[in-house]
Amino acid sequence: MKDELNKVVVYTDGACSGNPGPGGWGAVLLFDNGEKTICGGHPNTTNNRMELTAVVQALKFLDVTYVIDLYTDSVYVKSGITSWIKKWKINGWRTADKLPVKNLELWLELDKIVKYHKITWYWVKAHSGNLYNEKADMLARSQIVK
């Protein structure tokens, strides 16, 4: 009988004070046997970079292949990984406006990491009372160095 893959639910968020400015990211990983939180920050960044970093760091934390339900409140992240990235690759990592894709190194890293997992991507409305999205937001905000 085939082994069933490990499952995890992940909530990520990024925050920035000013854009650009100091920022933070946070992730809540919900395993069958408990919860793990991770977070970090950067002194000069953007909100989109922190949103993307949260997802990359959460996926890098996982040391084996998982079936993942991943929740983000970032349309940039969800649309980027589920839709835009296909065209960016075809266009030599350029946007529809022929401009270089911003945060390219993070998109390249995410593109590589997602191949190791079976991820279903979800968008969740920010600040709408979702417990784990709020927790990820709190973690991200806690890392903003002022």
UniProtKB/Swiss-Prot annotation:
PROSITE patterns found in the cross-reference section:
RNASE_H_1
Q: Say which enzyme class the record assigns.
A: hydrolase
Any one Gene Ontology cellular component term annotated for this protein: cytoplasm
Which cystines does this chain contain? none
The UniProt GO MF terms for this protein read: magnesium ion binding; nucleic acid binding; RNA-DNA hybrid ribonuclease activity
Report whether Cytoplasm shows up as a keyword of the record.
Answer: yes
Which Pfam families does the UniProt record give? Answer: RNase_H
Give the catalysed reaction(s), semicolon-separated: Endonucleolytic cleavage to 5'-phosphomonoester
EC numbers, comma separated: 3.1.26.4
Write the record's keywords in alphabetical order, separated by commas: Cytoplasm, Endonuclease, Hydrolase, Magnesium, Metal-binding, Nuclease
Q: Write out the residues that bind Mg(2+) 1.
A: 13, 51, 73
Q: Which cofactor does it need?
A: Mg(2+)
> What InterPro entries does the record point to?
RNase_H, RNaseH-like_sf, RNaseH_domain, RNaseH_sf, RNaseHI
* Binding sites annotated in the UniProt record for Mg(2+) 2: 13, 137
Protein's cellular compartments = Cytoplasm
Extract the HAMAP family matched here: RNase_H
Q: Which family does it belong to?
A: Belongs to the RNase H family.
The protein here is known as Ribonuclease H
Query: Which gene underlies this protein?
Result: rnhA
